[in-house]
């Protein structure tokens, strides 16, 4: 395909390229002095407040970005997604995670069929099962109620549900509903992760949820077989049907594994793994822990942002504005990374989830039509809750590389603490930093200011902060299940907007396949050498040397012996 078909060939893209020089001559100190500009660079929806005035952008920049959105046919692409058109063209699939949280009476089609009734059928099944489970009516093989859940999955089957679970653990309403229960996640095939996931758990009171659409995911199924052995070795083979359930569409393999197909919960090809937290992948384990009503509030929060994203004008559309600013930072200003900085410990797993969501979605080098891109896409996402990150990597953000930052704050703490005699509450202390850091990045500190403070001359260069480092602030009113759902949906749609503008497919992930196929070759080699003494062959010198070193140490346990982890 000719490069002219790419977004970078449009007049709107070229206008932004020409605009970069003017922006590079400005400083955020000066831009922030314009109160009208600062007021204009905000958006609000249902109490969620976005302030992007500390971005290296002017009103003219935003006008040009909105024109770029029109050139990229952003509105049309959003409508196609919501209407169930197969915008994931490389896999010939619809992209309908919005249907997972749509109201019961909504109509969202895929292949001409409204998928919403089927979604609600699965949710109703989850609701019924979770109520039976939580009431104590569902008992294990020895007649004891099950109070522990281990969810086995990887990638999107793990990171999204873990983020939501971690955010809800300290929400008063959700925590009350979860009393006396444990939810753990097992993702890595490393046996250490198995050991940690079952440490201090009793198979008699534990339910294992195996999450694999095809029931063939290598890491997940090995972990599932390991936990099956853990259950069987303690309770016998008949216990599997009472202590293991599945989220899968492959009922044949589910049954062969020993799980009752009636206890398998479906999801669909139009749900990508990293977008699946609102499907049975997340809804089932979270409902077992917190009860379906809490999870439904989470889904309603996500749905509220879906409506905002679909209906609001781009000028005040939070996900659209965030997506456009990311395109500006990456493709025009040349910033390759983004720091996600929630000033809420409850959001400690947000950055890892967004890391997968963003980097797997937009880490592409060709257009949706297969044309090589001549511009950068995607960001390197990382982050840590404040104020922990301030004592970790903020040094680089302040005085090293320029990294745009997302500051996320919450007005009302989940767990307020105030000590008599203290100047401020614990939450106010946290939020003091939330409000200060964006200004520190924007304004910096000049040599003149340091001289006026009588700083020794030899320290002036070390204590100078250039400033002009972009950030945005997202302020949530509180952090209940509803707001957690809203935050998830904001980032999901922001990332989609970026992909729509860049003209890439944000909903496939071919980059994960090559490593898998090469690992299969290594797996055969390890088995052949361990069991039959076959020499290492068929690899390059480096890999052969590494394999030889690894295989030179015999395993502590023979391959024909079952050994389970002990911690």
Swiss-Prot record:
Pathway: Carbohydrate degradation; glycolysis; D-glyceraldehyde 3-phosphate and glycerone phosphate from D-glucose: step 2/4. Belongs to the GPI family. GO terms for biological process: gluconeogenesis; glucose 6-phosphate metabolic process; glycolytic process. It holds the Pfam family PGI. One of its GO terms (cellular component) is cytosol. Keywords: Cytoplasm, Gluconeogenesis, Glycolysis, Isomerase. Its EC number is 5.3.1.9. This is Glucose-6-phosphate isomerase, cytosolic. It comes from the Eukaryota. Transmembrane segments: none annotated. The active site is at 360 (proton donor), 391, 516. It catalyses: alpha-D-glucose 6-phosphate = beta-D-fructose 6-phosphate. GO terms for molecular function: carbohydrate derivative binding; glucose-6-phosphate isomerase activity; monosaccharide binding. NCBIfam families: PRK00179.1. The lineage of its organism: Eukaryota, Viridiplantae, Streptophyta, Embryophyta, Tracheophyta. It comes from Zea mays (Maize). It is found in: Cytoplasm. Homodimer.
């Amino acid at each position: 395909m000719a490069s002219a078909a790419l977004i970078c060939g449009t007049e709107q893209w070229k206008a932004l390229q020409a605009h970069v020089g003017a922006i590079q001559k400005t400083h955020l100190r000066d831009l922030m002095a314009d109160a009208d500009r600062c007021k204009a660079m905000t958006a609000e929806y249902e109490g969620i407040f976005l302030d992007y005035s500390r971005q290296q952008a002017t009103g003219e920049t935003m006008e040009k970005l909105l024109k770029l959105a029109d050139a990229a046919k952003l509105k049309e692409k959003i409508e196609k997604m919501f209407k169930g058109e197969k915008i994931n063209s490389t896999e010939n699939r619809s992209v309908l995670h919005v249907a997972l949280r749509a109201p019961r009476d909504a109509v969202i089609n895929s292949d001409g069929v409204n998928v919403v009734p089927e979604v609600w059928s699965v949710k109703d099944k989850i609701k019924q099962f979770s109520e039976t489970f939580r009431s104590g009516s569902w008992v294990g093989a020895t007649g004891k109620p099950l109070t522990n859940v281990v969810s086995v999955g990887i990638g999107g089957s793990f990171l999204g549900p873990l983020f939501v679970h971690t955010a809800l653990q300290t929400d008063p309403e959700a925590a009350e509903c979860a009393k006396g229960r444990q939810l753990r996640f097992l993702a890595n095939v490393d046996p250490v992760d198995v050991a940690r996931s079952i440490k201090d758990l009793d198979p008699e009171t534990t339910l294992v949820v195996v999450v694999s659409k095809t029931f063939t995911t290598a890491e997940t199924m090995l972990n599932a077989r390991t936990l099956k052995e853990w259950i069987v070795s303690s309770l016998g083979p008949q216990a599997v049907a009472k202590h293991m359930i599945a989220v899968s569409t492959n009922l044949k393999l589910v049954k062969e594994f020993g799980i009752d197909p009636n206890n398998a919960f479906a999801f669909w090809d139009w749900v990508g793994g990293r977008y699946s937290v609102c499907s049975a992948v997340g809804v089932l384990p979270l409902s077992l822990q917190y009860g379906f009503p809490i999870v439904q509030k989470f889904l309603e929060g996500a749905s509220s942002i879906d409506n905002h994203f679909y209906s609001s004008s781009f000028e005040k559309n939070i996900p659209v504005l965030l997506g456009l600013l990311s395109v500006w930072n990456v493709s025009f200003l040349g910033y390759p990374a983004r720091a996600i900085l929630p000033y809420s410990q409850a959001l400690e797993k947000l950055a890892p989830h967004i890391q997968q969501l963003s980097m797997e979605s937009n880490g592409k080098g060709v257009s949706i039509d297969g044309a090589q891109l001549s511009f950068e896409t995607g960001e390197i996402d990382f982050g840590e809750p404040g104020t922990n990150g301030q004592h970790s990597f903020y040094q680089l953000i302040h005085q090293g590389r320029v990294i745009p930052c997302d500051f996320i704050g919450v007005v009302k703490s989940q767990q307020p603490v105030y000590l008599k005699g203290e100047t401020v509450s614990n939450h106010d202390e946290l939020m003091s930093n939330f409000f200060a850091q964006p200004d520190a990045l924007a304004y910096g500190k000049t040599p003149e200011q340091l001289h006026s403070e009588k700083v020794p001359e030899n320290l002036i260069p070390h204590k100078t902060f250039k400033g002009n480092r972009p950030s945005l602030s997202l302020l949530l009113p509180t952090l209940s299940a509803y707001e957690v759902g809203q935050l998830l949906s904001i980032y999901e749609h922001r990332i989609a907007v970026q992909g729509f503008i860049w003209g890439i497919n944000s909903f496939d992930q071919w980059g994960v396949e090559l490593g898998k196929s090469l690992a299969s070759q290594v797996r055969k080699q390890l088995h052949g050498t361990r069991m039959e003494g076959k020499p290492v062959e068929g690899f390059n010198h480096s890999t052969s040397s590494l394999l030889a070193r690894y295989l030179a140490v015999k395993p502590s346990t023979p391959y024909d012996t079952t050994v389970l982890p002990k911690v």
